């Protein structure tokens, strides 16, 4: 049956089945419902369709030769098999089907008895190759073969005996930190010191004991951050923390050494018959043989006209299965399959003993910042910080309490004149006094208003020349001038670097056919040609006359061993032959099975040292080495998880004060300390905002009275004078009530740091703080000990065919094997020379129907027939377990648009949710419950078949899929010997599902049974994981009406809103046993969370549901009585569902193809160029997209793939640096780094557009891991600057330095691992012309590339210039 199923379907379904099985194992057992009673026997079905052609009957006795009949008309084409091989309960037939069509013409009949001795005929055609002769004697030893390629590295040898103690080794690398010691016992608290008496004010004394903390003042505004202090000296290395919790899975480690070979697999299935090989070259003509034994019947005459058809033979019994063929040759090694899914995390292994100190690794990349260390002790006083910018004015604080009354101030200045008193009553008129003295001049009157503008004055005389002004600031650059005329052509530039090879050009047009040559001279007569191969077997000739027995001819020489012929049909058992003479010693047979292990041989001489093998597994820990010297302090490790509390340790001595730590976070408020001494006076703060007005001061004391003058005459009141100048301030009045605090003044400059106070007693340990957030993933840890072996995984998918492995070393010749079985029949030989035509025999009488001859050789394959109609939909397969959640597949190819279905009933609008922030895309949510079925859309037209895709890799075996279209009929197999007809056995207990048996004889139809009781509803199943989103199916045909089932348990409420009660169930199929619940359908779009509404009224009845699946669940048994036979070709049997299945399979196939064969595009990048070359060997070198770190393709990078060398090349950005002339800070005889010093810290970068430098660094790190070789070149363009060899001195002292990626310096001479080579050196002498030197560095340590910087030495002169051109870095 399987031969009719589309192989792709099986592969895809196999994957689904395997995943489902895994999921089933994980999800725990599912309670299976009780098996229902067996239903009654169904009614007698309608007459089945026509049965298949019966098997040919046994051979009849040979008939007499028939008279030649007239030529028959061409036979109609046979029916195309549309075998749907399905079990059916309905296939009870009322008897044998109608007689089948006439079968194909049978093979020629058996050869008749030998006729009488004929005349000596002409030499017959060469006979078929004889059976394989006995093995010849052992030949002489062949010449030694070429040395085989190196074999795979052997397993690591056993450890040798301990050698003599060597000399004192070099200083070892620092060992790993020891395990943490137990915590020391807490020491006794020291006695509190006595408080010192205050001394006389003198030189500032040592700081006193800290005073008690004062009451906490109001929190000051946060000061501006000071400048970052200098990095303190590194503290001593901390004790090793306890082992942290298991970190996230690190990136895949380097590929380990090859494991030991697995156990031999079970013998594979018999391979298909290989294609007929091309005939081998003809061997040299042998010597003419002696006269052979009398030949068989003479040359076959032309076949007679076909006889009349014989009677149809009785149906033969099914033949016994044939003998299993010999196992096929092992196929070539498959290409490594994709990496299997990560196994479950093994249990944590025990900590192994410390291994011996490893060799020093290369400097690692800079690690992520460690977690914040504990706060160090206060550092020494820093330098005075810069004055901060003034802060914003603070809000006014509350009014403070009234201050104490101040002591009386010093005597104040006289107060201002008091206000005039109230006017007294008018006095009596006095007597006229004498004339007074002229009074002083009155106060100047108020200035008059400005007069009108006077007439313009005459121009003044010119002034003296003023001093020359200061030079003004440089003006802004002027507008660009017009472009100047085109200058003369410059000298021809130097040749650029060799570019990447261009893509391969298209094939040229085929050349014109040449003219016909002159006919050649006739050649000399050739040697006799070799015997031709057998001609095709002719039809049997007429029965010859009985010949007389010829004389025994001499034995001919043994012929060449013929090729094994194809397997012939089973002949009748021959009579036992006479015992033959013992044969000569045969040729060496094939290697026998592996013998038992021999005793160990003597130790051989030491061979030459072999190549370095791949790293072996870790050996047992060696003895402890001598203690190495203390290593350099390592970088702080990331904080480990808290270990269990240790025993208290002894009190340690006071440590040396550490360097100043970085500013820690604000600690919790401490207890109140003792009052400290006054600090040094700070710099006065800025003047605050004016306070509120004070209360009026007391009146000042009256001044001393002056001598009274004579009374003057009463003057008339003058005009009111202007306000006089303010009088002097009066004495200070008493303190007014405290005003509102002024606005906060600007922050004063930071005072000098006070001296450190004495460290207070250690506070009690605070409660453990909450766990901080997880730090960033630490750097990749060293490789952990191997976990325990995981459970045996499921068989991986067969890998793609790998390249053939290297030839192994030729083994010793095996012992002679037993004589091989008779070989299969060799391929048909070339046609022999045409024999002379025999005379036409007389027409014999018509023969009886002959026994069926053996099957003829299969004819050449006919032209493919037209595709048969779609087979019937197969019976539903076993319900698969829900598959595990697959990774999100790539978007499938858009299917053809179906016609839109009618609109469904619109749901009630949900409440508007608040707008959420745009989140990162979440993982697919759990699937909601399936919504109600919409009205069925009209069927869309089926799409045309797409082009066949590339062949995918072999998938996991799938569950049985729907029956595919019938394949073309295979060639007739050879008929085996007829078996005896067995008696009908008793019915046995139900066994496990076996393979499909041969068709049994039809039994009589039973009476119709009674309808069975309704089955119990099954238990509610676990919610399945979401499957791949299927294509929306077309509405199925309605099933036969059944009884309504009980209401199932309600599913979990989906998030999409209130769901009404389920509508009435549609008609169901015939009741079967309750099956396992099916997988949940595709998830709908997740709606916003609706509030739980009241249950709505029952909806209208839905459309009829699709037919129910056949019951049986996992109690699947083949209980059908018969196969359902072929459907007639004309009946339309293609159901609409088949289109959906076919489209889904095509989509899955395309997605898997895409995963397995990357295209090098941005959406489907490869991992490296090597993967692209393996997937598309016909592609040319060009730019492609790759994604070395896999995962999301958003950070894929565009690289140049050089398929001729297998390299992945990444360009620097930018490639050229601008030319640099004299660099003023260049010191004599000192290299200057271009990026770090001259360009202000910008090193060479290798960015790709759209990818950040961090992402690019990650991709480069993965490229280094994936490659085992790297190379790069850099071109130094110079003018009067030496780049490598100084031709004047012949030294390399002025050669440039290069900085690699791991901070290694690459030099011109020295250690060969770190020296670069020079391809072109045009900068060896100073010629006032531009030249260039091309430097190349190749390494098998990809971590050293790409170049990050270059440091020339010979620069800085007024006539010196240089620039750099960075070539691409290529990984392989």
From Swiss-Prot:
Leader sequence segment: 1-22
Gene that this sequence comes from: Col1a2
BP terms from Gene Ontology: blood vessel development; bone mineralization; cellular response to amino acid stimulus; collagen fibril organization; collagen metabolic process; extracellular matrix assembly; protein heterotrimerization; regulation of blood pressure
SMART domains registered for this protein in UniProt: COLFI
Localization: Secreted, Extracellular space, Extracellular matrix
Keyword field contains Secreted: yes
Similarity annotation: Belongs to the fibrillar collagen family.
Positions of transmembrane segments: none
Stated role: Type I collagen is a member of group I collagen (fibrillar forming collagen).
Residue span, Fibrillar collagen NC1 domain: 1139-1372
Organism of origin: Mus musculus
Protein name: Collagen alpha-2(I) chain
Pfam families cross-referenced by the UniProt entry: COLFI, Collagen
The record's note on its domains: The C-terminal propeptide, also known as COLFI domain, have crucial roles in tissue growth and repair by controlling both the intracellular assembly of procollagen molecules and the extracellular assembly of collagen fibrils. It binds a calcium ion which is essential for its function.
Sites bearing 5-hydroxylysine, chain numbering: 183
Record PTM: Prolines at the third position of the tripeptide repeating unit (G-X-Y) are hydroxylated in some or all of the chains.
Record: residues binding Ca(2+): 1187, 1189-1190, 1192, 1195
UniProt feature, compositional bias: Basic and acidic residues: 147-161, 744-753, 1011-1022
Presence of keyword Cell membrane: no
Propeptide cleavage-removed residue intervals: 23-85, 1126-1372
């Amino acid at each position: 049956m399987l031969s009719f199923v589309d192989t792709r379907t099986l592969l895809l379904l196999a994957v689904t089945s395997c995943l489902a099985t895994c999921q089933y194992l994980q999800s725990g057992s599912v309670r299976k419902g009780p098996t229902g009673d067996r239903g009654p026997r169904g009614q007698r079905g309608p007459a089945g369709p026509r049965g298949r052609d019966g098997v040919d009957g046994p051979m009849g006795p040979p008939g007499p030769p028939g008279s030649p009949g007239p030529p028959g008309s061409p036979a109609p084409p046979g029916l195309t098999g549309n075998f749907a091989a399905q079990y059916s309960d309905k296939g009870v037939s009322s008897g044998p089907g109608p007689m089948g069509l006439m079968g194909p013409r049978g093979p020629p009949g058996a050869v008749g008895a030998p006729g009488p001795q004929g005349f000596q005929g002409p030499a017959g055609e060469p006979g078929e190759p004889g059976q394989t002769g006995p093995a010849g004697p052992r030949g002489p030893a062949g010449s030694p073969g070429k040395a085989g390629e190196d074999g795979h590295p052997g397993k690591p040898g056993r450890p040798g005996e301990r050698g003599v103690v060597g000399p004192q080794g070099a200083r070892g690398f620092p060992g790993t930190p020891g395990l943490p010691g137990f915590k020391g016992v807490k020491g006794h608290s020291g006695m509190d010191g006595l408080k010192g008496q205050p001394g006389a004010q003198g030189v500032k004394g040592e700081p006193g004991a800290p005073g008690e903390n004062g009451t906490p003042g109001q929190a000051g505004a946060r000061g501006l951050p000071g400048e970052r202090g200098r990095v303190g000296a590194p503290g001593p290395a901390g004790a090793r923390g306890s082992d942290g919790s298991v970190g996230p899975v690190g990136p895949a480690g380097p590929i380990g050494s090859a494991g030991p070979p697995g156990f031999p697999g079970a013998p594979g299935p018999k391979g298909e018959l290989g294609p007929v090989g091309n005939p081998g070259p003809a061997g040299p003509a042998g010597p003419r043989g002696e006269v052979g034994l009398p030949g068989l019947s003479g040359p076959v005459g032309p076949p007679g006209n076909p006889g009349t058809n014989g009677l149809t033979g009785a149906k033969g019994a099914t033949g016994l299965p044939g003998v299993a063929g010999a196992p096929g040759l092992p196929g070539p090694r498959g290409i490594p399959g994709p990496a299997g899914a990560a196994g479950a995390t093994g249990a944590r292994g025990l900590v192994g003993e410390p291994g011996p100190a490893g060799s020093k690794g290369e400097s690692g990349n800079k690690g992520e910042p460690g977690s914040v260390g504990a706060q160090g002790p206060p550092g020494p006083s820093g330098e005075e910080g810069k004055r901060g910018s003034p802060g914003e004015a603070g809000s006014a604080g509350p009014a403070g309490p009234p201050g104490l009354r101040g002591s009386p101030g010093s005597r104040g200045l006289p107060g201002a004149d008091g206000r005039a008193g109230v006017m007294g009553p008018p006095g009596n008129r006095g007597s006229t006094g004498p004339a007074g003295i002229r009074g002083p001049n009155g106060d100047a009157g108020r200035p008059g208003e400005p007069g009108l503008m006077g007439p313009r004055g005459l121009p003044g005389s010119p002034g003296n020349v003023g001093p020359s002004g200061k030079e003004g600031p440089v003006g802004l650059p002027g507008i660009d001038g017009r472009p100047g005329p085109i200058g003369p052509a410059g000298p021809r530039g130097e040749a650029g670097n060799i570019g990447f090879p261009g893509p391969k050009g298209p094939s040229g047009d085929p050349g014109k056919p040449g003219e016909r040559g002159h006919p050649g001279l006739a050649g000399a007569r050739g040697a006799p040609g070799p015997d031709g191969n057998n001609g095709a077997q002719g039809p049997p000739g007429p029965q010859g006359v009985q010949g007389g027995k010829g004389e025994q001819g001499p034995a001919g020489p043994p012929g060449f061993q013929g090729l094994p012929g194809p397997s012939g049909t089973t002949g009748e058992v021959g009579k036992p032959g006479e015992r033959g003479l013992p044969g000569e010693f045969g040729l060496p047979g094939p290697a026998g099975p592996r013998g038992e292990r021999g005793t160990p041989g003597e130790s051989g001489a030491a061979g030459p040292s072999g190549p370095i093998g791949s790293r072996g597994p870790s050996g047992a820990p060696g003895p402890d080495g001598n203690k190495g010297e203390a290593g350099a302090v390592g970088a702080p490790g990331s904080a480990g998880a808290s270990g269990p509390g240790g025993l208290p340790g002894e009190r340690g001595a006071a440590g040396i004060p550490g360097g100043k730590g970085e500013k820690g976070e604000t600690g919790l408020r401490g207890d109140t300390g003792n009052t400290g001494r006054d600090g040094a006076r700070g710099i006065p703060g800025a003047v605050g905002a004016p306070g509120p007005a004070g209360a009026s001061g007391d009146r000042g004391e009256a001044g001393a009275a002056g001598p009274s003058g004579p009374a003057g005459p009463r003057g008339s009141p003058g005009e009111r004078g202007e306000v006089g100048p303010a009088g002097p301030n009066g004495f200070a009045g008493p303190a007014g009530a405290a005003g509102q605090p002024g606005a906060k003044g600007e922050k004063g400059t930071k005072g000098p740091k006070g001296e450190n106070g004495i460290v207070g007693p250690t506070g009690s340990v605070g409660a453990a703080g909450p766990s901080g957030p997880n730090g960033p993933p630490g750097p990749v840890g060293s490789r952990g000990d191997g976990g325990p072996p995981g459970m045996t995984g499921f068989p991986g998918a067969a890998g793609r065919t790998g390249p053939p492995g290297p030839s192994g070393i030729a083994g010793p010749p095996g012992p002679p094997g037993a004589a091989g079985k008779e070989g299969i029949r060799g391929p048909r030989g070339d046609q022999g020379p045409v024999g002379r035509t025999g005379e036409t025999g007389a027409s014999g009488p018509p023969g009886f129907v002959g026994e069926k001859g053996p099957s003829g050789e299969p004819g050449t394959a006919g032209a493919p027939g037209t595709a048969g109609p779609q087979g019937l939909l197969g019976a539903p397969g076993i319900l698969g377990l829900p598959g595990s959640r697959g990774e999100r597949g790539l978007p499938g190819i858009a299917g053809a648009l179906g016609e839109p279905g009618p609109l469904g009933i619109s749901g009630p609008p949900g409440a508007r949710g608040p707008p959420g922030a745009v989140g990162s895309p979440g993982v697919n949510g759990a699937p909601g419950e399936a919504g109600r079925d919409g009205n069925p859309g009209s069927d869309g037209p089926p799409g045309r078949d797409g082009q066949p895709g590339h062949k995918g890799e072999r998938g996991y075996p799938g569950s049985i899929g729907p029956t595919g279209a019938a394949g073309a009929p295979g060639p007739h197999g050879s008929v085996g010997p007829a078996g005896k007809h067995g008696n009908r056995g008793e019915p046995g207990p139900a066994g496990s599902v076996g393979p499909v048996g041969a068709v049994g004889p039809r039994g009589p139809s039973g009476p119709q049974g009674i309808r069975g009781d309704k089955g119990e509803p099954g238990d509610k199943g676990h919610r399945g994981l979401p499957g791949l989103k299927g294509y929306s199916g077309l509405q199925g045909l309605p099933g036969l009406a059944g009884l309504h089932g009980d209401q199932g348990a309600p599913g979990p409420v989906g998030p999409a809103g209130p769901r009404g009660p389920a509508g009435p169930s549609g008609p169901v199929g015939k009741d079967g046993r309750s099956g396992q619940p099916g997988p949940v359908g595709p998830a709908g779009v997740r709606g916003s969370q609706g509030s739980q509404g009241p249950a709505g009224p029952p909806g209208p009845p839905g459309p009829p549901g699709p037919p129910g699946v056949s019951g049986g669940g996992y109690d699947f048994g083949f209980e059908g009585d018969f196969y359902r036979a072929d459907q007639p070709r004309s009946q339309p049997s293609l159901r609409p569902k088949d289109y959906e299945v076919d489209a889904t399979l095509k989509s899955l196939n395309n997605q898997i193809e895409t995963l397995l064969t990357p295209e090098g595009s941005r959406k489907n990048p490869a991992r490296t160029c090597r993967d692209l070359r393996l997937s598309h060997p016909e592609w040319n070198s060009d730019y492609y997209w790759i994604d070395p770190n896999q995962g999301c393709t958003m950070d894929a990078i565009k690289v140049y793939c050089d398929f001729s060398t297998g390299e992945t090349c990444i360009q620097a950005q930018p490639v050229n640096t601008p030319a640099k002339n004299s660099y003023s800070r260049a010191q004599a005889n000192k290299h200057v780094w271009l990026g770090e010093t001259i360009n202000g810290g910008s090193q060479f970068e290798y960015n790709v557009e759209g990818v950040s430098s961090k992402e690019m660094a990650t991709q480069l790190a993965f490229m280094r891991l994936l490659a085992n070789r790297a190379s790069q070149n850099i071109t130094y363009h110079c003018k009067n600057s030496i780049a490598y060899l100084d031709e004047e001195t012949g030294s390399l002292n002025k050669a440039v330095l290069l900085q690699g990626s791991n901070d290694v310096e690459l030099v011109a001479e020295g250690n060969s691992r770190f020296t670069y080579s020079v391809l072109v050196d045009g900068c060896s002498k100073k010629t006032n012309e531009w030249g260039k030197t091309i430097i190349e560095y190749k390494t098998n340590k990809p971590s050293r590339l790409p170049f990050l910087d270059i440091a020339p030495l010979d620069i800085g002169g007024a006539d010196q210039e240089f620039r750099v051109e960075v070539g691409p870095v290529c990984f392989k």
